[in-house]
């Protein structure tokens, strides 16, 4: 299990525990469960990279303790 922190820069920080084999779509669903927003509206970024739903966290080299940027569309 790894823990990922997502910050939306509006004062909301979400900590999510998941597996490295989970997809970005799975991570968005876990974030949506904590924030109360729909997972379709969530966009996850790191710098200028937008993470796509079907790709696994390990493929993006997302590891324990990493911070991601959380945006809403």
Swiss-Prot record:
Species whose genome carries this gene: Drosophila melanogaster
GO biological process, any: protein modification process
GO molecular function: protein tag activity
Keyword Zinc: no
Annotated Gene Ontology cellular component terms: cytoplasm; nucleus
Superkingdom of the source species: Eukaryota
The keyword Protein biosynthesis belongs to this UniProt entry's keyword annotation: no
Subcellular location(s) per record: Cytoplasm
Pfam families assigned to the protein according to its UniProt record, in alphabetical order: Ubiquitin_2 (PF14560)
The protein's name in its UniProt record: Ubiquitin-like protein 5
InterPro entries in the cross-refs: Hub1/Ubl5, Ubiquitin-like_dom, Ubiquitin-like_domsf
